[in-house]
Amino acid sequence: WTSAQKDKVTREIIMGMNWWASLAPDAQNLSFALYSFSDPSVGRTSYEPIKRPQSDEGLWINEIMTNLGYTSGSYFAKVDSLNNWLKSEANADEAFTIFVVNDYNDADNKFADGYFAYAYLGGPFMVMTYDNDGYGIANMDAVFAHETGHIFHAYDEYASSGCECTESYNGCQNQNCENGCVDDVCCI
């Protein structure tokens, strides 16, 4: 990672956070705090994430979490522990972790199985590549915003995802699915 790359990633993530904050109703106080662990020893792993499939994430995420001092449980449990610490530090309601993988020297800017950005519904983390499959670093804010939606239980909206209009979380249906929803809500 160069300093310029790290700075650009930080700026793009902040722009994505600001986009979400700008959508909050006036009565809501939505803000984000960004903590960065950019010490090279923390992010060092014996695996090259970009050369592996997404399904191998546990190998390198586990090492990174151990480097951060989280040594107990699965890699998901370790990330949950970090997120709980982040919530406490920021006095926040929620926290999630972002892993950004440097794909600068990778020809297709994707993991071995074609993934380039993903998050788990409800968290605890998302993974993005630097170039985001041709969206480019200049559009990382949009990719981040999309994946953040998944962290907070938003489903995919594009037709090829297999989304359904009746998918719901907390009783709110996925009306931005491109597969013929009644309300046809806009999506990112």
Description of each model-found segment:
Residues W1, F99-N105, Y130-N132, A154:
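Active-site-proximal beta-strand/loop segments in catalytic clefts of secreted hydrolases
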Residues W1-A92, D131:
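Propeptide-to-catalytic entry region of secreted or membrane-anchored zinc metalloproteases
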Residues L82-K87, A112-F116, I137:
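Short secondary-structure capping micro-motifs at structural edges
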Residues K87-A90, A117-Y118, E178-C181:
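A general structural signal for short secondary-structure junctions and capping/turn motifs
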Residues N91-A95, G123:
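Extracytoplasmic
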Residues Y104-P124:
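Catalytic zinc-binding patch centered on the HExxH motif and its immediate surroundings
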Residues L121-I188:
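The catalytic-center signature of Zn2+-dependent metalloproteases
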